[in-house]
């Protein structure tokens, strides 16, 4: 596997870096009304205006027809900047799955170049990314009726459409459709999130995507999640390295102390390992290969190791790490939200253990305890 960025990936990274330099600072985000969801609407508009949101779209919609490998690079840059915008949700949870599943997808994508948000309802109560969702989609005349309950639906209130995994496939639902109830839920980063109740929500036949749609959505979502998480790890490590190189104690930078330098090194290894896992997952998906193991390994590393690195980096900042006008807390809080979205370390280890047991032809149960 060649880890050198292609010319397209390098161009995406350069464009993303340039646009993300205008992201709202931690101080600016802290000044927003924190009784409401907090996200960078100004940056989101610029991402649309600069064509960043159109990168994976078909040429018929003015896009560049790029895939998960290039979107993964973009999300890594979003993570490095700790930008509070729904690029992950719109491209990773929405555009890429819709394009992969085909059908009548373009009608749901038409508003994305102008800044429409897409998202997915990946989790159910007590069941993160379930392979067999409890939410149902029952045939009714020339359409379907969707009933169920989803949790941790990011940017649901702001979205034009939500991809909803069901027993029959992935339903594309408008969040303001009759029968949909959204209830705001708390996030560590204060980014928008809701519980989504669906009570007999009608959709037309073209709004139900089948053919292994739930697994396709989950694989792309996990690869995208891991890419952004890798960027968060890299961004926090870089911020910490800069801090410990300039913060002096006992007459010299604290980076000169072995205990500090070892913790920075540990954080670096965590971020690079997650980047490797995410890159591998994106590459396999882009090549049409089985990426189940790669996405599950990346999700486990995200859930198990990235929070430890974030805690270490925050600790090395001292009291500054808890200052909401300083960027360190953004990386930590966004990481907490992503860990919760994938289900936490015990859940991910159980999934990974079951996958290994299946490959070995044995039954097994795993726990991180």
Model-derived features: positions:
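Short glycine/proline-enriched turns and hinge-like loops at secondary-structure junctions
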Residues: 66, 129-132, 155-159
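Flexible, small-/acidic-enriched active-site or ligand-binding loops
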Residues: 134, 152-155, 175-207, 211-213
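A short, Trp-centered hydrophobic/proline-enriched beta-strand micro-motif
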Residues: 114-127
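A short core secondary-structure module
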Residues: 121-123, 147-181
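N-terminal glycine-rich flavin-associated loop
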Residues: 85-103
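Cytochrome P450 C-terminal beta-domain/meander region
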Residues: 131-147
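Alpha-helical interface subdomain recognition
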Residues: 1-79, 219-369
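Short beta-strand-to-turn element immediately C-terminal to the catalytic PLP-Schiff-base lysine
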Residues: 98-102, 138, 164-167, 172-175, ...
């Amino acid at each position: 596997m060649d880890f050198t960025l292609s010319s397209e990936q390098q161009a995406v990274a350069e464009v993303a870096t340039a646009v993300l330099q205008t992201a709202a600072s931690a101080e600016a985000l802290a000044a927003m009304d924190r009784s409401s969801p907090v996200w960078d609407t100004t940056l989101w508009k610029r991402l649309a205006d600069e064509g960043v949101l159109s990168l994976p779209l078909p040429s018929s919609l003015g896009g560049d027809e790029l895939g998960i490998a290039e979107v993964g690079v973009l999300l890594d840059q979003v993570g490095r900047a700790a930008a509070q915008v729904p690029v992950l949700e719109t491209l990773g949870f929405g555009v890429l799955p819709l394009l992969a599943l085909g059908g009548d997808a373009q009608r749901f994508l038409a508003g994305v170049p102008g800044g429409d948000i897409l998202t997915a309802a990946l989790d159910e109560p007590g069941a993160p990314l379930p392979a067999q969702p409890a939410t149902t989609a029952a045939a009714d005349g020339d359409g379907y009726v969707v009933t169920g309950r989803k949790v941790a639906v990011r940017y649901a209130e702001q979205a034009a459409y939500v991809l909803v995994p069901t027993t029959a496939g992935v339903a594309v639902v408008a969040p303001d459709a009759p029968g949909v109830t959204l209830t705001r839920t708390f996030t560590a980063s204060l980014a928008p999130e809701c519980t989504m109740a669906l009570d007999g929500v009608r959709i037309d036949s073209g709004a139900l995507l089948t053919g292994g749609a739930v697994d396709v959505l989950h694989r792309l979502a996990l690869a995208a999640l891991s890419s952004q998480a890798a960027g968060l790890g890299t961004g926090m490590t870089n911020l910490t390295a800069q801090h410990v190189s300039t913060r002096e104690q006992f007459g010299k930078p604290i980076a000169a102390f072995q205990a500090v330098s070892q913790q920075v090194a540990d954080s670096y290894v965590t971020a690079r390992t997650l980047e490797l896992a995410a890159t591998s997952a994106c590459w396999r998906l882009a090549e049409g290969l089985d990426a189940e193991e790669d996405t599950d390994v990346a999700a486990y590393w995200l859930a198990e190791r990235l929070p430890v690195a974030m805690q270490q980096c925050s600790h090395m900042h001292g009291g500054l790490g808890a200052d909401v006008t300083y960027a360190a807390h953004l990386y930590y809080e966004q990481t907490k939200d992503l860990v919760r979205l994938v289900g936490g370390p015990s859940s991910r280890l159980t999934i990974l253990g079951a996958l290994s047991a299946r490959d070995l032809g044995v039954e097994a149960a795993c726990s991180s305890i």
